[in-house]
């Protein structure tokens, strides 16, 4: 070895490291979320069918094993009071509780608590241990039970094991195997921060963000006056599931805390009674943990050494577990029966007066003004404590609306139980979608309004000859094909893959509020629905019946067939919901801000139009190629929401051609913004200066963004005209059937098999 030569072999850096595109261009349009639907990310393979696996599950044996686990305390993580029930309730609650009704994202639907960022949130400290306690059971039952189902079912079993009968349980949540990058959790850069979601929020804390005295070291005597929580967020702080249990920004004001609670739980689709029941019911079990300040804990699981094998927050205080556990920084046991359902939470809340104190970790909490020591110690049977509560607990008494509800429950505990188990069931199942996805022997018979129920099909479905007849009749009904296409799209594209709401089934496009949404062009919609109802009435006078939901989709499909000159698959079986089956207020959250496929809407100062388009495509469960081909096809079909010519880059509108891409990528065009908003653009011939087209940001992004342009170029090629039509038809069918969970598990993709009966 020559002198000066490094004795250590040079090792190159590795893939994925170094300065990334997002470092150079932090505001670039990110299409990575459209790649989350790639089945290659699933180690179980693209043909894995969780529904079929779940049907093989010995459900009773699983519940028996979970019941046994509740009291099988492990030395490496001992059970409080000898029972893991409180821990597992928190695990299930924090899995499902990330759901927000605004965009349907979050929730426990695919087991995201296992991945970043949720697995490292300050509010999820110690849940790494809860999931590890479950691993032997998950390993035993394997593919028959997903992590997503198991975490929530375990919370249910925990309640039952402590004397709280539940409302039921439905399985059917298939696991994902990667972090969901689509969810906007907030713009704060420090744990427990709120300075982005609130106009005058706090910066947050350094270190690992365990909630203790850190967050209110800056003297604040009054709660913040601006509590307008940023949309679509529900949590009050970065890294919390709900609200700050110490009070707004750590200020122990129960009345102010009630405001945050109402906002947060409201955005989870819970009313005041459901909110109060969840807090009271959840806090009837277990305890919080704040044995010492957070300086005693190590990094979160994602930041820890390999030797910890996914564990985080290693605790150097005392034994590091049991009585020395540090989780939230609060040290509260709410009732004298922490492993048994009772009404003692409310009894104590109203029996005692409360005074502020500091936990051993320095957090604000409340202790009863009494000499009674009636609360058991979690690990020493000879020790008793005074009752304690959180600031958010006192809100259940101090807020007038909550106080009215909870005082009644003090005298009528059965009403509390009924409200709690229903709210708990809703919490766990709000993002499950239609009942056709619900699996298992404990699915409740009672149909609930928040399910967005649709009637079950009755009688024989329409067959091939019926479909052919109806296609002819809808095309002869005097409605322009473009209007039929727009209406079918409007009906089906209300679907949200996040919480499986919306879609064409139910024909809710004819009901409030969807019939009045601007994007659905109410005047035109009424015209189309009237014509289709006429066709339906005539057909239904015979022996077979067709739902309006099916007819809306069939009419759009027939119009696409006419424009494409190829057969477009159609699968009947939809039914029509009633207004009474529709929670209009809840459905308001499904109204789109933009729909780039119909060239509708525009961005804001905070979010660009094209970012909203990618967001919409993700909610529709589309890939980038599907987003591109569907947009180009809808433009060629003249399907803009208002019939405008923006982006209709063709001399033959109404025909399914690739003209949109050919003309968008024409080098002879020069585009200029029509005004300072840069939402509308005009395309000029470079030589003559003649204006040829107008376009919006919805259109021009496909020529500007490198990845989207690469796909657009593919469809603009002379040898891909047939591919364009084929891919558009496949994308159309996908949109029309996004909510058809009743058929998705019965067959593979239609495009791989051709049109099989009764699909046409």
From Swiss-Prot:
InterPro entries reported for this sequence: Catalase_peroxidase (IPR000763), Haem_peroxidase (IPR002016), Haem_peroxidase_sf (IPR010255), Peroxidases_AS (IPR019794), Peroxidases_heam-ligand_BS (IPR019793)
GO molecular function, one term: heme binding
Binding residues for heme b: 283
Bias type Basic and acidic residues, positions: 213-226
Keyword Zinc listed: no
UniProt entry keywords in alphabetical sequence: Cytoplasm, Heme, Hydrogen peroxide, Iron, Metal-binding, Oxidoreductase, Peroxidase
GO cellular component: cytosol
Localization in the cell: Cytoplasm
A single BP term in Gene Ontology: hydrogen peroxide catabolic process
Keyword field contains Transit peptide: no
Transmembrane regions: none
Pfam families referenced in this protein's UniProt entry, alphabetically: peroxidase
Record PTM: Formation of the three residue Trp-Tyr-Met cross-link is important for the catalase, but not the peroxidase activity of the enzyme.
Cofactor needs: heme b
Catalytic activities: H2O2 + AH2 = A + 2 H2O; 2 H2O2 = O2 + 2 H2O
Similarity comment: Belongs to the peroxidase family. Peroxidase/catalase subfamily.
Function: Bifunctional enzyme with both catalase and broad-spectrum peroxidase activity.
Assembly and oligomerization: Homodimer or homotetramer.
Designated name of the protein: Catalase-peroxidase
Gene from which the chain derives: katG
């Amino acid at each position: 070895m020559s002198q000066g030569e490094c004795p250590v072999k040079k090792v190159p850096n590795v893939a994925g490291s170094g300065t990334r595109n997002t470092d150079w261009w932090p505001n670039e349009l990110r299409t990575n979320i459209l790649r989350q639907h790639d089945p290659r990310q699933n180690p179980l393979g693209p043909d894995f069918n969780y529904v079929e696996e779940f049907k093989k599950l010995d459900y009773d044996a699983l519940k028996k094993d979970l019941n046994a686990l509740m009291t099988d305390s492990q030395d490496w993580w001992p059970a409080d009071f000898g029972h893991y029930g409180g821990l597992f309730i928190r695990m299930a609650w924090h899995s499902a509780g990330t759901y927000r009704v605004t965009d349907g994202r979050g929730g426990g639907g695919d087991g995201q608590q296992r991945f970043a960022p949720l697995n490292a949130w300050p509010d999820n400290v110690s849940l790494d241990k809860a999931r590890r306690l479950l691993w032997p059971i998950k390993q035993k039952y394997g593919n028959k039970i997903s992590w997503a189902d198991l975490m929530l079912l375990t919370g249910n079993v925990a309640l039952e094991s402590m004397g709280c009968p539940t409302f039921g349980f439905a399985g059917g949540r298939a696991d994902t195997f990667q972090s969901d990058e689509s969810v906007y959790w907030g713009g704060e850069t420090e744990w427990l921060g709120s300075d982005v979601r609130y106009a005058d929020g706090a910066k947050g804390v350094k270190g690992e963000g365990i909630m203790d005295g850190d967050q209110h070291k800056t003297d604040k005597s009054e709660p913040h006056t601006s509590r307008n929580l940023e949309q679509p967020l529900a949590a009050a702080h970065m890294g919390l599931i709900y609200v700050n249990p110490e009070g707004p920004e750590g200020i122990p004001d129960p009345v102010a805390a009630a405001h945050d609670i109402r906002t947060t739980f409201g955005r989870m689709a819970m009313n005041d009674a459901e909110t109060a029941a969840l807090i009271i019911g959840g806090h009837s079990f277990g305890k919080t943990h704040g044995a010492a300040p957070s300086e005693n804990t190590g990094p979160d699981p994602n930041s820890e050494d390999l030797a910890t094998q996914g564990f985080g927050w290693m605790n150097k205080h005392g034994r590091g577990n049991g009585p020395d556990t540090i989780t939230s920084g609060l040290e509260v046991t709410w009732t004298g029966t922490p492993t048994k359902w009772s009404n003692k939470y409310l009894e104590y809340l109203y029996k005692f007066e409360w005074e502020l104190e500091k936990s051993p970790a320095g957090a604000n909490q409340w202790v009863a003004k009494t000499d009674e020591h009636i609360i058991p110690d979690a690990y020493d049977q000879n020790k008793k404590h005074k009752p304690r509560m959180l600031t958010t607990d006192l809100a259940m008494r101090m807020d007038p609306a909550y106080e009215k509800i909870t005082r009644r429950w003090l005298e009528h505990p059965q009403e509390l139980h009924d409200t709690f188990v229903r709210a708990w069931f809703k919490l766990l199942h709000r993002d499950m979608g239609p009942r056709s996805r619900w699996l298992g022997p404990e699915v409740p018979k009672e149909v609930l309004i928040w399910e967005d129920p649709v009637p079950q099909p009755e009688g024989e479905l329409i067959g091939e000859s019926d479909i052919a007849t109806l296609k002819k009749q809808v095309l002869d009904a005097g409605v322009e094909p473009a209007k039929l296409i727009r209406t079918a799209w409007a009906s089906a594209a209300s679907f949200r893959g996040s919480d499986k709401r919306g879609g064409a089934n139910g024909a809710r496009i004819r009901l409030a509020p969807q019939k009045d949404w601007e994007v659905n062009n109410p005047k035109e919609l009424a015209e189309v629905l009237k014509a289709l109802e006429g066709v339906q009435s005539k057909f239904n006078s015979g022996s077979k019946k067709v739902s309006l939901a099916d007819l809306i989709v069939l009419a759009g499909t027939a119009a696409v067939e006419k424009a494409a000159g190829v057969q477009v698959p159609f699968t009947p079986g939809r039914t029509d919901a009633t207004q009474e089956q529709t929670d209009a207020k809840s459905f308001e959250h499904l109204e789109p801000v933009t729909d780039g496929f119909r060239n509708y809407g525009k961005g804001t100062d905070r979010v660009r139009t094209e970012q909203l388009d990618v967001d919409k495509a993700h909610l529709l469960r589309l890939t980038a190629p599907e987003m591109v081909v569907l947009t180009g096809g809808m433009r060629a079909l003249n399907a803009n929401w208002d019939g405008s010519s923006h982006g209709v880059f063709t001399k033959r509108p109404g025909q399914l051609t690739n003209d949109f891409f050919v003309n968008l990528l024409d080098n002879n065009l020069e585009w200029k913004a029509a005004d300072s908003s840069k939402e509308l653009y005009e395309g000029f011939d470079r030589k003559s200066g003649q204006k040829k087209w107008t376009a919006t940001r919805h259109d021009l992004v496909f020529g500007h963004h490198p990845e989207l342009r690469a796909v657009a170029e593919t469809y603009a090629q002379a040898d891909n005209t047939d591919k364009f039509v084929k891919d558009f038809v496949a994308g159309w069918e996908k949109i029309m059937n996004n909510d058809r969970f009743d058929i998705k598990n019965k067959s593979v993709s239609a495009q791989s098999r051709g049109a099989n009966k009764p699909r046409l």
